[in-house]
């Protein structure tokens, strides 16, 4: 059985967990979990930043800061048991079922075959099975797109049209939203009779969120469907499994949610449907169990890695202990072959959160300046860290040692050195932004809204995150992928802006409670002379407009593999679950806690 390598600064000899080489292509398992999207979580600490001398010694112990509790998960996952014989059995069953599902793509005949294939694709995506059939799906979508006119001619079923639209947009085909004009009456509005089709209304609602900046009809569709769905969710006037699905969609849409979380819910919905295919249902349940065990293996290793960093003895208790939450966010990258991506991202997110909490919650301004200079020099030698307080030496060493592990992992790969340098540069950029925010925070300075986003959008670390994804990916042209990333700056800037705004919107009350005034809401209020309520409304609209612009960017021709583009999209999904109506990452509550239980506990 081929092993998945695990690397780590303190793990000594290389550990291994086995990969299942037939059903799930092997990859080298890196060692770190990806948590939530750490950004400027400035909410929960009293900023103390101006008077402490650089080498302050015992004075560090006198600083005032709000300590967040340790992870409530403790060592639970460090000692989790994964039955490898059970995984072997699951693998064999999965391999036996895959050809049967693959044959379904070829079994449909006649003009209706294209529609049936698109419905099958929607089902596979919803059940978390699409990564098993990437080639078949790509070929099928491409073939269907060439017969679009014939396929849609005379099709007046709302559910069918909405699903077809959803699949094409999901796979990067810019099908025109004009196909929904057929559902409008003479008055130019959507027909009220459509409201009797609950599944159709739900599918139109989902399709409406795939819109771009010029898909005005989808704005109308969103307005039309929302009130009906809210009524159905409140009154429960359709089948219970559909009511549950509607409520989930109103909370967090499928195309904005993490695939594995969608799959677990969709299986519950699908098994109660009259047209449920027993083979596909069985496949999806086996696949879900296998993935959960696979992820649990990763989390177990990452928990060990995290414990061995010994932050508890090296740092004051100002940082968030969130290794489980970090790994959960990496599950946005569902494919088992992306173990290395998930592990590297978890380590990068750990770097981000330690840096963020150090600069935002504890360090003096002089210390932040000194740490920034140390990271800018990128000198691993101890003499380069002289003058830093001991706790900052530990922070710097942790970052440098982690990147040394990255270097050992990727240096022999094609493009590995290039991708490593690019990731280091993004780490430096994030640190510079942390320094600028610290300077503003000390004086309570409110820059212009645009200037704030330029700085804070980098600090939220989307660029650093995407660079980490590319660093962890194998069998891609990394130089080409990074150049695409730089060229498509509009896309990544929009992602950064969304992450920044969402972070600030949900963290505003905590920011203000502790006197941290430099945030997007206050900067917008100052620049445009509006009220707090108006600023909130405008920033929420900016988030929605940003989603449209990103949808638009994803539909443009690309010169990189689909897997790279999808990974960027999955990063957005990770952001969404971490800020699902609240900042559940900092406060350890709400949906994020439920997601963890669903993935790692309820096996």
From Swiss-Prot:
Its EC number is 4.2.3.-. Mg(2+) 1 binds at residues 356, 360. Mg(2+) 3 binds at residues 503, 511. Its cofactor is Mg(2+); Mn(2+). GO terms for biological process: diterpenoid biosynthetic process. It comes from the Eukaryota. A motif (DDXXD motif) lies at residues 356-360. Gene3D superfamilies: Farnesyl Diphosphate Synthase, Terpene synthase, N-terminal domain. InterPro entries: Isoprenoid_synthase_dom_sf, Terpene_cyclase-like_1_C, Terpene_cyclase_plant_C1, Terpene_synth_N, Terpene_synth_N_sf, Terpene_synthase-like, Terpene_synthase_metal-bd, Terpenoid_cyclase/PrenylTrfase. The keyword Manganese applies. It is found in: Cytoplasm. One of its GO terms (molecular function) is magnesium ion binding. Keywords: Cytoplasm, Lyase, Magnesium, Manganese, Metal-binding. The Asp-Asp-Xaa-Xaa-Asp/Glu (DDXXD/E) motif is important for the catalytic activity, presumably through binding to Mg(2+). PANTHER family: OS04G0344100 PROTEIN-RELATED, TERPENOID SYNTHASE 9. Belongs to the terpene synthase family. Tpsa subfamily. This is Terpenoid synthase 28. The gene is TPS28.
